[in-house]
């Protein structure tokens, strides 16, 4: 990704803080919406969600200014690096501190989440490799492909350019997986 024009300035720090603040507000408001819905306040839940969507757009605006959004390859690489930091440094350090301060249950949660973050990194790196080796929609062996729009199933080494049932483009195909 390109460097941002604010590098090293107070404005860059302000943009980073604005991005973090808007991102946190968005998440909080989605949690608050769930509580309001459970308590029977549909309108309030909807307003929390509407505001959360606004906060998401504010955060996106600041993140774009920071040149934080690239193409999919760049985004996958950045996501993998972020997940790597979380599991190798952040959560490990948090767990050690929690343990030292007498919070072993919280330390265990930090470590458990760290393991999940490691899986996230592996997933992003695998997806990045698929793009780099042109294997997103074509594999060396026969696979089962499913259209994410209509559910049409195709067996072969490559997803069709266009779904023969719903006419959606190849980008709607993924490897079919049963999880039940």
What are the functions of these language-model segments?
Residues 1-180:
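Non-heme di-metal
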């Amino acid at each position: 990704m390109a460097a941002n024009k604010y590098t090293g300035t107070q404005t860059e720090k302000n943009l980073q803080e604005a991005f973090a603040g808007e991102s946190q507000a968005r998440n909080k408001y989605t949690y608050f919406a769930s509580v309001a819905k459970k308590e029977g306040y549909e309108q309030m839940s909807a307003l929390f969600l509407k505001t959360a969507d606004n906060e998401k757009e504010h955060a996106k605006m600041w993140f774009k200014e920071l040149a934080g959004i690239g193409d999919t390859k760049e985004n996958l690489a950045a996501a993998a690096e972020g997940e790597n930091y979380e599991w190798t440094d952040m959560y490990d350090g948090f767990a050690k501190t929690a343990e030292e301060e007498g919070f072993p249950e919280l330390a265990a949660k930090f470590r458990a989440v760290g393991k999940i973050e490691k899986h996230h990194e592996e997933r992003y790196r695998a997806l990045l490799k698929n793009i780099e080796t042109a294997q997103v929609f074509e594999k060396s062996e026969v696979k089962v492909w499913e259209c994410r729009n209509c559910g049409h199933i195709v067996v072969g080494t490559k997803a069709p350019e266009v779904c023969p049932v719903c006419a959606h483009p190849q980008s709607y195909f993924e490897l079919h997986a049963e999880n039940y």
